[in-house]
Curated annotation (Swiss-Prot):
Keywords: Ribonucleoprotein, Ribosomal protein, RNA-binding, rRNA-binding
Record protein name field: Large ribosomal subunit protein uL6
Pfam families (UniProt xref): Ribosomal_L6
Function in brief: This protein binds to the 23S rRNA, and is important in its secondary structure. It is located near the subunit interface in the base of the L7/L12 stalk, and near the tRNA binding site of the peptidyltransferase center.
GO molecular function: rRNA binding; structural constituent of ribosome
Residues that span the membrane, as ranges: none
Protein origin, superkingdom: Bacteria
The protein's assembly and partners: Part of the 50S ribosomal subunit.
Protein family membership: Belongs to the universal ribosomal protein uL6 family.
Signal peptide: none
Length: 177
């Protein structure tokens, strides 16, 4: 039995939720998102929130139960507060700048890398060594941050590259003579 799935998802203040069959729609101050649950999951809108239950007792239905509840909770938080991910750039000559809506990265290549964010994602560069990716869709924010980090991931010897702000790089010792 899913300990996460048992609890109903509370609808935060300022957010309106609507359940239509397998589709949950949430509208809030930041925008609108929806989640379509699998056929193995039943959704009901109640006074205390959205309750998620497996349609049958199969292992497959139970495995999707907690994940479905968490996805619904994520869309509620996204339309109310939004999500953001911070990235840091370390290295001599490595820097970021905004070029319109596009992100321009100087990462030691012979050319600058230009990244065009998808619709619904905003990128801010408060300092040349700091990037903030924000939006209402948690999965999309994480995906964009991972794509930016992938251009030049942190290396273990000097720690140069793009890393998450909370990430800790395990450093290696160089060659000995």
């Amino acid at each position: 039995m899913s300990r996460i799935g048992k609890k109903p998802v509370p609808v935060p203040a300022g957010v309106t939720a609507n359940v239509d069959g397998q589709k949950v729609t949430a509208k809030g101050p930041k925008g609108e998102l929806f989640f379509v649950a699998n056929d193995d999951i039943q959704l009901k809108l109640e006074d205390n929130g959205v309750s998620v239950t497996p349609a049958n007792g199969t292992k497959e239905a139970r495995s999707k139960w907690g994940m479905s509840r968490t996805m619904i909770e994520n869309i509620f938080k996204g339309v109310k507060d939004g999500y953001e991910r911070k990235l840091e750039i370390n290295g001599v000559g490595y820097r970021a700048a905004l070029q319109g809506k596009n992100l321009q990265l100087a990462l030691g290549f012979s050319h600058d890398v230009v990244y065009e964010p998808p619709v619904g994602i905003t990128i801010a560069v408060p300092k040349p060594t700091e990037i903030i990716v924000s939006g209402i869709n948690k999965q999309q924010v994480g995906q964009v941050a991972a794509e930016i980090r992938e251009y030049r991931g942190p290396e273990p010897y000097k720690g140069k590259g793009v890393k998450y702000a909370e990430e800790r790089i395990v450093r290696k010792e160089g060659k000995k003579k």
